[in-house]
Regions:
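Glycine-enriched catalytic-core subsegment of oxygenase/oxidase enzymes
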Residues: 3-5, 10, 14-206
């Protein structure tokens, strides 16, 4: 799931918090299947991101295979949907679906009514929901980059795949993003760039 859905589910925090690459990733896997080089279908993957300019460090957890985070009483909810995302801040918590869609601030009824009456100003360009092709065409017509251009999408995917490596080996990984190296596990580092067959090499810089 992490290698597939995270590019949808984690797009919001990755972009909004300017996460970049994690320096540490650890996967807790109740029933690892590493002997067959498979990824178990149940795990919790914990990513640690350092400070970014004036933004503080961030801890991110990815739950899959039935694993769920504990529910806090102040959220006022009884359970979670099948998939989704929580952004837990110092003051409030945002909950979305897995895409992530249908965002909801977990507030009391009074706070929610006040928020609806006095919403923050829209300072960020909006993209019509579930219309990425429209955004792509508009970007070409107006000579600008779409939100999910290759420069952005490649980093989002890299973050996810480092997590997948931790899942695959039920391991703790220390990641040097600048050099794209796993510094504490040479055996896992070998999987970042596997040798290409003759005639299929794509070079070092895409």
């Amino acid at each position: 799931q992490l290698g597939d859905w995270s590019c949808h589910t984690l797009d919001g925090p990755f972009w909004g918090l300017d996460l970049g690459m994690p320096h540490t990733v650890e996967a807790t896997v109740p029933n690892p299947r590493t002997q067959h080089h498979f990824i178990a279908d149940e795990s919790v993957t914990h990513m640690q991101f350092g400070a970014r300019g004036n933004k503080p460090p961030v801890s991110l957890k990815w739950y899959e295979g039935g694993e769920k985070p504990p529910i806090r009483p102040e959220w006022g909810i009884k359970g979670f949907k099948r998939s989704g995302m929580l952004m837990i801040g110092d003051k409030k918590t945002l909950m979305t679906g897995g895409r992530p869609n249908d965002p909801v601030l977990l507030l009391s009824d009074e706070e929610w009514k006040d928020f609806q009456k006095n919403p923050p100003k829209k300072t960020i360009p909006r993209v019509k929901e579930e219309a990425p092709v429209d955004e792509w065409i508009n970007a070409m017509k107006n000579n600008r980059l779409p939100g999910s251009h290759f420069g952005y999408a490649a980093e989002l995917t890299e973050m996810a795949l480092v997590g997948v490596l931790a899942q695959r080996f039920a391991a703790k990984i220390e990641y040097d993003a600048k050099n794209m190296k796993i510094t504490n596990r040479p055996d896992i580092d070998a999987y970042i760039k596997e040798p290409a067959r003759e005639g299929w090499s794509y070079g070092e810089s895409l």
